[in-house]
Swiss-Prot record:
Name recorded for this polypeptide: UDP-N-acetylmuramoylalanine--D-glutamate ligase
Listed GO CC annotations: cytoplasm
Keyword Cell division carried by entry: yes
Encoding gene, per UniProt annotation: murD
Binding, ATP: G121, T122, N123, G124, K125, S126, T127
Catalysed reactions listed for this entry: UDP-N-acetyl-alpha-D-muramoyl-L-alanine + D-glutamate + ATP = UDP-N-acetyl-alpha-D-muramoyl-L-alanyl-D-glutamate + ADP + phosphate + H(+)
Record's keyword annotation contains Cell wall biogenesis/degradation: yes
Organism field: Agrobacterium fabrum (strain C58 / ATCC 33970)
Functional note: Cell wall formation. Catalyzes the addition of glutamate to the nucleotide precursor UDP-N-acetylmuramoyl-L-alanine (UMA).
Biological process (GO), any one: cell division
Amino acid sequence: MIPVTSFRGKKVALFGLGGSGLVTARALVAGGAAVVAFDDNPDSVAKAQAEGIATADLHTIDWSSFSSFVLAPGVPLTHPKPHWSVDLAKAAGVEVIGDIELFIRERRVHAPDCPFIAITGTNGKSTTTALIAHILQSSGRDTQLGGNIGTAVLSLDPPKAQRFYVVECSSYQIDLAPTINPTAGILLNLTPDHLDRHGTMQHYADVKERLVAGSGTAIVGVDDSHSTLIADRIERAGVKVERISKRNVVSEGLYAEGSQILRAHGGTSSLLVDLDGIQTLRGSHNAQNAAAAIAACLAVGVSEEEIRAGLKSFPGLKHRMQPVGRRGNVTFVNDSKATNADAAAPALSSFDRIYWIAGGLPKAGGITSLSPLFPRIAKAYLIGEAAAEFAATLGEAVPYEISGTLDKAVQHAAADAEKDATAGNVVMLSPACASFDQYKNFEIRGDSFVAQVAALEGMTMLVHSGKGG
């Protein structure tokens, strides 16, 4: 745990006592802050009380006596409208921050020069974050991995010199971290997502920009217009920018040509690594993820040789284009993390004949952008609330059925793929949708897919059944 000593003796209000919120409350108490916490869920309040954390309905407190208000990242700060606790804090002139900001302030006090790599973007954050941490760990460096990837940042070990922090940051977390200042900050890409929480694409982009604007080295993917503008703007403001691209040659930075990652500097380009044969980094999207990871590791002093070794031994992540089973000539792939069309595109681009399970809670734009990839789809099996919308988009271009539920989709797709004599058939869950209409999160959806694949007769599993690997 990182005790938040920079708030010792100060009164801090906190809302949100879920996983990271409870960790934050503990860290503030351990650092000597006087914490008053609350949550809309009485069970969460009771759990905090059982640990000796002071709780009170934040409607009733005297806000003028508090120095700061810490908000859990899952609670609306601005859109669709501010949470009532945010309104109360702002009315009293109390700053509203999150756990990433608390980490930043502790680092600033105790180890301001310890390497801190922060990663954001619409797609690819978790893979890039895990890849950077793996390269650092495999090269023998003291590495702490946390943030949006699943481990609360304040549950990590305290900052000290030569301890490396690799932190995945969601837009919600950045919004609550006004002084974020990583050694190396990564913005992978920007496409419409979470607009229910940010209102407009411009506000979403502005929030993401904060992470790289405060970085020692800003690593920015320039394959979309919003990110390109951000790279140009922060460079004019004096930030050192490394551009990365999976589509085009860049004059300064890293870019991909097929499976090769090249570094451009001073008018010349040199080969850094060839990803060919690294199954966990298959596809052009992973070329971008690898380029970003390489740039970040170079920025914090990792050698090219250490980076190459780490790339080759990367085990990959669950729910991300993950082969989970094989039966006959059919491979079953779990890509449950693909919660929008842009995230599904890399997997659809990586295989030639796909029995595609898609659907769930649809995002803005649906799957229209995937139409160039429709020829790769042998048949689609549509589930969840998006089924009718996706069926209308597929029209006569792709055979489809409305399966409704994941279990039916797996059974029907497996049967159809088995009848197809084409080599290299793939049954793939790559939903292009959020999971919340049928599952609590994409992980549970992916684990359900794996369990249902494991239940098919004659299946050779490539991961532990029901656990997604």
